[in-house]
Amino acid sequence: MFEKISQFLVPIAGRLNNNRYLQVLRDAFMLAFPLTIFGSIFVVLTNLPFLNKIMNASMLTSFQSHFGIASTATMGIMSVFVVFGIGYYLSKSYQVEAVFGGAIALVSFLLLTPFIIQPETGDAITGVIPVDRLGAKGMFLGMITAFLSGEIYRRIVQKNLTIKMPAGVPPAVAKSFAALIPAFITLTVFLLINVMVTLFFKTNMHDVIYHAIQAPLVGLGSGIIPTLIAVFFIQILWFFGLHGQIIINSVMDPIWNTLQVENLSAYTAGKEIPHIISKPFMEIYTVGMGGTGMTLAIVFTILIFMKSRQMKQVSKLGLAPGIFNVNEPIIFGLPIVMNPIIIVPWVLAPMVVTLVTYLAMSAGLVPPPTGVTVPWTVPLFINGIMATNSIMGGVMQLINLLIVFVIWFPFLKAMDKLNLAKEKEQAVQETAAQQNDNSIKM
């Protein structure tokens, strides 16, 4: 049965993993990763719960105002980095000049962005870009624009509709002239789109895409049922030896990252955090507990309660990496991959933990993640506190470890008995072989 399922899943997962556009999207978000880490660090520092006890109100306001710009300049305009990254990596995948692909994508996005702010009272302010258009609110338009502009740009380049300079011209100058016609045509397309939408429909592409595509998708992706489905497929893919995170996250990351940016914007503005499900939720309360499947609980269970020598050796090897959320020694050494004995807890435990965590946050027992990006190698409990800015975030992880322990224990016990029987049989065979060798020598 497992072989038939594997034969069905592996080709699909392979196509998803090798899809050009999903790879580009993943790389584009990783381009923004170090910048979001920088911004997140200062969000944590400016919102430490004890600051109001060591600073007066005026000093605290000044501190948050001066250092809070770090999150606005990174997480607050994340769409800018993603758009450039998509244009860059898409062009690179087609082996055309990547830097110009990124720059053209970014300008195409800006051409569709309204340079106007309408205050609640007073006249509109022109010549400025609302920051929210460059953050979560503009994410989906940015991605769509970047892919379209990248495709237009590379097709024009590949058709040789470029200006070719003499051989003696410096390479930088030659490349600039080569990109001139593709850039002009691509940018003209998006300029005309903006003109038509503005003149004939009295709106802008940001609002069109946000209301027609982004809001429905984000609303769907923030629900617990789609999240549980995503967790289910992540675990199933890992069971068959495929990297579930890379495959599923390449589809879900645009939604989860958008939710994260919206949460951070609300948090830094002092508003209620709107979403429970987001990228940090998925990383901290699934991967951030010893790696995929929360295997740190499995390691502790084996070391404390199991007797099999093989299982204990694997767990000892997996303990140190597991503290930093690296669990390949457990997945492939225990093994978990293609092991029918433990497919049930492997799939069930993360889904139960995800549901329990969601319900605890919905009930207000644990604050939801604030939107800060916590490096995935930060150990358990610490990453929970950092993600939620509350000790309850870490406590929730400890409770989740107990849940994983309860679900896994009977299955590990069964596996332990089987391994003990094999080890005893192997020991008997080795003893018999040694006695046989001794008798031959005598």
Swiss-Prot record:
Gene Ontology molecular-function annotations: protein-N(PI)-phosphohistidine-sugar phosphotransferase activity
Subcellular location: Cell membrane
Induction: Up-regulated by konjac glucomannan and by cellobiose and mannobiose, the possible degradation products of glucomannan. Repressed by glucose via the carbon catabolite repression system. Also repressed by GmuR.
Membrane-crossing residue ranges in chain numbering: 28-48, 67-87, 97-117, 138-157, 177-197, 205-225, 228-248, 286-306, 329-349, 365-385, 391-411
The entry's keywords: Cell membrane, Membrane, Phosphotransferase system, Polysaccharide transport, Sugar transport, Transmembrane, Transmembrane helix, Transport
Domain (PTS EIIC type-3): residue spans on this chain: 5-411
Keyword Repressor: no
GO terms for biological process, alphabetical: carbohydrate derivative transport; phosphoenolpyruvate-dependent sugar phosphotransferase system; polysaccharide transport
Pfam families: PTS_EIIC
Entry GO terms, CC: plasma membrane
Coiled coil: none
Keyword Transmembrane listed: yes
Functional description taken from the UniProt entry: The phosphoenolpyruvate-dependent sugar phosphotransferase system (sugar PTS), a major carbohydrate active transport system, catalyzes the phosphorylation of incoming sugar substrates concomitantly with their translocation across the cell membrane. The enzyme II GmuABC PTS system is involved in the transport of oligo-glucomannans such as cellobiose or mannobiose.
Free-text note regarding domains: The EIIC type-3 domain forms the PTS system translocation channel and contains the specific substrate-binding site.
Listed name of the protein: PTS system oligo-beta-mannoside-specific EIIC component
